[in-house]
Amino acid sequence: MPLLLSGRGFRRELESAGCMAVHAPLEGGAETRLLRRLRAAGYRTHLTSARGLGDPEVFLFQKHGVRPPHLGHQSVGRGAAVGEVHDVMPLLGEVFLGDKPVVLWLLEGQVLSRSELLSLCDLCRREPRLKIVVEMGGARSLRWQPMTQLLAA
């Protein structure tokens, strides 16, 4: 049985564009197949959700503060006026340690605003080893296009 999707065309377009928008079938399977093909081609991959991303550059590359959930408890003068803040390590901190290129696959990318998507494209331009794939919704068959083309339309 021949392979239905070798991933070679997707990889070539991802390397040239840097940031891709993907519309994948809702039953799944196509994205994991592409991730497996990218890993076999020498990429490091990281799969995460776009929900709660905040400022993409800070969240991915810098140590940043996150407020824990409230859970209905009263703070009795323990924190500052803004409440407790926990320092969190960057999401892609350890992934960038080697020389391998990195693919960040963002699920549920349709929740991101236009400015957040543009900032992701700028990150790919500034960091040549970083490639970003954003799932922008479902489709009957797997299709992709550069993010700049999607945002220009």
Curated annotation (Swiss-Prot):
Task: Report the locations given in the UniProt record.
Answer: Cellular thylakoid membrane
InterPro entries found in the cross-reference section: NAD(P)H-quinone_OxRdtase_su_N (IPR020874)
Q: Per UniProt, which keywords does this protein have? A: Membrane, NAD, NADP, Plastoquinone, Quinone, Thylakoid, Translocase, Transport
Please give the catalytic activity noted in the UniProt record: a plastoquinone + NADH + (n+1) H(+)(in) = a plastoquinol + NAD(+) + n H(+)(out); a plastoquinone + NADPH + (n+1) H(+)(in) = a plastoquinol + NADP(+) + n H(+)(out)
Reported EC number(s) for this entry are 7.1.1.-
Primary localization: membrane
Q: Which domain of life is it from?
A: Bacteria
> What GO terms are given for molecular function?
oxidoreductase activity, acting on NAD(P)H, quinone or similar compound as acceptor; quinone binding
Task: Give GO cellular component annotations, separated by semicolons.
Answer: plasma membrane-derived thylakoid membrane
**UniProt keyword Translocase, yes or no:** yes
Enzyme class, one word? translocase
**Membrane topology listed for this record:** Peripheral membrane protein
Determine if Signal is one of this entry's keywords. no
Note the subunit structure: NDH-1 can be composed of about 15 different subunits; different subcomplexes with different compositions have been identified which probably have different functions.
Function, as annotated, reads: NDH-1 shuttles electrons from an unknown electron donor, via FMN and iron-sulfur (Fe-S) centers, to quinones in the respiratory and/or the photosynthetic chain. The immediate electron acceptor for the enzyme in this species is believed to be plastoquinone. Couples the redox reaction to proton translocation, and thus conserves the redox energy in a proton gradient. Cyanobacterial NDH-1 also plays a role in inorganic carbon-concentration.
Into which family does the record put it? Belongs to the complex I NdhN subunit family.
Q: What is this protein called?
A: NAD(P)H-quinone oxidoreductase subunit N
Question: What species is this protein from?
Answer: Synechococcus sp. (strain WH7803)
Phylogenetic lineage = Bacteria, Bacillati, Cyanobacteriota, Cyanophyceae, Synechococcales
